[in-house]
């Protein structure tokens, strides 16, 4: 057998061990492949999010270790989709979602389509009291590293803006980037 000089498989478990320090909060994800027409990320827990992501491309989830809850929001409400260890799930484009990874040491793989010039990703926050949308931000994330670099800035900006965090419907103040309310995630 003649092995290819540059294309080689690698040990995923060792890769996770070598990158364990980057699979922790606040975002807890690490890009696996940079030179591809898809984005392959490894995501670690614990991490619970209080924002909802509006992705213009499909997202494929494979839960390697531990369980997660994928919160989904639409016009009728907020729902939970459990993704258990060993399970996969395909999320269609533009479905508002908030991955909840409350288990320490959980590991998942998320594969997304490549971003192209002009594509925008949205981030929305909903009132925990009445489920009204309190804020939305759209940003171009047309490079794989974009989400890793831009998410902390997006979250910080929202957390520091009292007006953006105040629900126009009921006046409740969203916690910003603080912890989600008790009972938000039940695995």
Give residue spans per PLM region.
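Jelly-roll (double-stranded beta-helix
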Residues: 1-62, 67-88, 96-187
């Amino acid at each position: 057998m003649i092995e290819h000089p540059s294309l080689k498989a690698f040990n995923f478990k060792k890769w996770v061990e070598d990158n364990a320090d980057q699979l922790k909060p606040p975002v807890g994800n690490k890009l696996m492949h940079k030179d591809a027409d898809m984005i392959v990320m490894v995501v670690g827990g614990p991490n619970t999010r209080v924002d909802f992501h509006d992705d213009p491309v499909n997202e494929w989830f494979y839960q390697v270790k531990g369980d997660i809850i994928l919160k989904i929001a639409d016009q009728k409400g907020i729902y939970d989709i459990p993704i258990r260890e060993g399970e996969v799930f395909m999320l269609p484009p533009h479905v508002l979602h908030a991955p909840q990874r409350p288990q320490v040491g959980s590991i998942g793989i998320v594969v997304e389509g490549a971003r192209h010039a002009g594509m925008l990703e949205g981030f929305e926050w909903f009132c925990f009291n009445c489920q009204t949308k309190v804020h939305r931000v759209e940003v171009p994330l047309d490079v794989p590293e974009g989400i890793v670099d831009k998410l902390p800035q997006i979250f910080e900006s929202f957390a520091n803006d009292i007006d953006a965090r105040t629900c126009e419907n009921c006046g409740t103040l969203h916690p910003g980037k603080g912890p989600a309310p008790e009972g938000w995630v039940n695995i």
